[in-house]
Amino acid sequence: MAKDTRSRKKVARRSVSEGIAHIHASFNNTIVTITDRQGNALAWATSGGQGFRGSRKSTPFAAQVAAEVAGKAAQEYGVKNIDVLVKGPGPGRESAVRALGALGYKVNSISDVTPIPHNGCRAPKKRRV
């Protein structure tokens, strides 16, 4: 079987100075996505993807690790300033924002964009433990 010897073009890394960090914190997992101003994803990470499984996925430490991984990947694009959009009620909200600040990002604003229904779909029944 012959090997494919065609040369592949390297994709040039864009230089982006400002970005938006989308933090989706659910009760089961935390997803951190860093995008440019137009919404094109530069880097993303999840607490489940960092090796945390089961109930450890939903811890603040797992969200912190996911934010660090996504933040380091976005720094390769030259991102310095970020706006943070936090969505969801999960336990990883604050720790993910703190982790991004500790990486050296200048956090311009923090916004809560959790969707709140104006009496939409019926909520799931309450747990009886």
From Swiss-Prot:
**What subunit structure does UniProt give?**
Part of the 30S ribosomal subunit. Interacts with proteins S7 and S18. Binds to IF-3.
Gene Ontology BP annotations: translation
Q: Which gene encodes it?
A: rpsK
Q: What PANTHER family does the annotation carry?
A: 40S RIBOSOMAL PROTEIN S14/30S RIBOSOMAL PROTEIN S11 (PTHR11759)
Any one GO CC term of this protein is:
ribonucleoprotein complex
Looking up SUPFAM superfamilies in the UniProt record yields: Translational machinery components
Query: What HAMAP family does the entry give?
Result: Ribosomal_uS11 (MF_01310)
Keywords in alphabetical order: Ribonucleoprotein, Ribosomal protein, RNA-binding, rRNA-binding
InterPro entries for the chain: Ribosomal_uS11, Ribosomal_uS11_bac-type, Ribosomal_uS11_CS, Ribosomal_uS11_sf
GO MF terms listed in the record are: rRNA binding; structural constituent of ribosome
What this chain does, per the entry, is described as: Located on the platform of the 30S subunit, it bridges several disparate RNA helices of the 16S rRNA. Forms part of the Shine-Dalgarno cleft in the 70S ribosome.
- Superkingdom in the source lineage: Bacteria
The protein's name is Small ribosomal subunit protein uS11
Q: Hey, which family's this protein in?
A: Belongs to the universal ribosomal protein uS11 family.
